[in-house]
């Protein structure tokens, strides 16, 4: 008997809940010291992108569902974390595939610079995953808290690390984006919040002794998204291996910057397999 696809589901997402002392948030990864409260959980209705009309697009909304058939096998993805040869293969083959899909959906792209590749896998159930958010071992786990990968200062930092300060200054004169190709996710659409920007809707968690620098480059703080009742929540049901979501995890025009998060879907069976995802981040200039 066929099962109907629901246009929406209900789930839980974590959002910024401030600090214990009212000051800027910090996390010391060496000692575990922090003043950041655990993310506050909100029950949300999440609408299926497949059922939306019109469909969201990268150029209009900052995110888009696309097909990206790949020649890379699951074994080759796994090997990327085990050997330099495996890592080099991903950079040579998969990065080229991701660049091509960004060119197709973005249009008018001047420069695309892939900067990172990561595989994430959930280890354990909801409670343990949430509790481990600040732990070193959670660095490759899904992030069940709404966030942005970068804002303007931290995007400039990774650009300078990648191409050098002189080349960075040349590129900074152009419109810049940080698209990621990733699955599975919940997007926080803020089309109904015309004043949305990094200053009003993002809390900072300053990092000390951060082990993630080797994976993602220097980032002085993480950007955790604040609650706003005007958000619309979107996801993709039954995402297939040949599909992915291209979105702007940072954009120099805040309208296109897309807050995102793993979320806990109440309709997922208790014995469902752990959440897994593959992501590539690129710096894109127009």
Curated annotation (Swiss-Prot):
MF annotations from Gene Ontology: oxidoreductase activity
Keyword Oxidoreductase: yes
EC number(s) per entry: 1.-.-.-
Keywords of the record: Oxidoreductase
Pathway: Secondary metabolite biosynthesis
Cross-referenced InterPro entries: AsaB-like
This protein's record includes keyword Endoplasmic reticulum: no
Protein's job: Oxidoreductase; part of the gene cluster that mediates the biosynthesis of squalestatin S1 (SQS1, also known as zaragozic acid A), a heavily oxidized fungal polyketide that offers potent cholesterol lowering activity by targeting squalene synthase (SS). SQS1 is composed of a 2,8-dioxobicyclic[3.2.1]octane-3,4,5-tricarboxyclic acid core that is connected to two lipophilic polyketide arms.
The family this protein is said to belong to: Belongs to the asaB hydroxylase/desaturase family.
Name by which UniProt lists this protein: Oxidoreductase clz15
Primary gene name: clz15
